[in-house]
Amino acid sequence: VHWTAEEKSAITAIWGKVDVAAIGGEALCRLLIVYPWTQRFFTSFGNLSNAAAIQSNAQVKAHGKKVFTAFGDAVKNPEGVKDTFAKLSELHCDKLHVDPVNFKLLGQILITVLAAHFGKDFTPNVQAAYQKLVSVVAHALAHQYH
């Protein structure tokens, strides 16, 4: 995948303002609420019975931070995404058996959360760059499945 200087700049400019714990927690909460079947991968997290329970669940927030800390590695090195996520792809495929469609769903949720947080700064060009990045990350995470 070829990355232009403009795309890299758009991605890093927004990501530099991201509170990974807040954005990550919100994104994972939204995933679990909007796509409730994804909750089956998080049964060890305790009460996920409704939106309020999910939004107040410390394990959901902590895992969201962990997920988007890893996503930050893609922001830093978009050319190396496949290598960066090789072990996570293996984990999600071989041990967790996560349907790779869920990676795309989480990417879409991230874009929604970023747009909500950054408003006018999340221009169509910024959105296009993030759309490209979340697609590349989702593909890398699904790599072990192929």
UniProtKB/Swiss-Prot annotation:
Domain Globin as annotated: residue spans: 2-146
Disulfide bond sites: none
Keyword terms: Heme, Iron, Metal-binding, Oxygen transport, Transport
GO biological process entries = hydrogen peroxide catabolic process
CDD domains in alphabetical order: Hb-beta-like
Q: Which InterPro entries match?
A: Globin, Globin-like_sf, Globin/Proto, Hemoglobin_b, Hemoglobin_oxygen_transport
Kindly list the GO CC terms recorded for this protein. blood microparticle; haptoglobin-hemoglobin complex; hemoglobin complex
Spell out the Gene3D superfamilies in the cross-references: Globins
Expression tissues:
Red blood cells.
On the tree of life, the source organism's domain of life is Eukaryota
Protein residues bound to heme b:
H63, H92
The record's section on Pfam families has:
Globin
- Gene Ontology molecular function, alphabetical: haptoglobin binding; heme binding; metal ion binding; organic acid binding; oxygen binding; oxygen carrier activity; peroxidase activity
**Biological role:** Involved in oxygen transport from the lung to the various peripheral tissues.
Q: Please state which protein family the record places this protein in.
A: Belongs to the globin family.
Q: Which PANTHER family match?
A: HEMOGLOBIN FAMILY MEMBER (PTHR11442), HEMOGLOBIN SUBUNIT EPSILON (PTHR11442:SF7)
Kindly state the subunit structure of this protein: Heterotetramer of two alpha chains and two beta chains. Oxygenation results in dissociation to dimers.
Q: What is this protein called?
A: Hemoglobin subunit beta
- Native organism is Erythrolamprus miliaris (South American water snake)
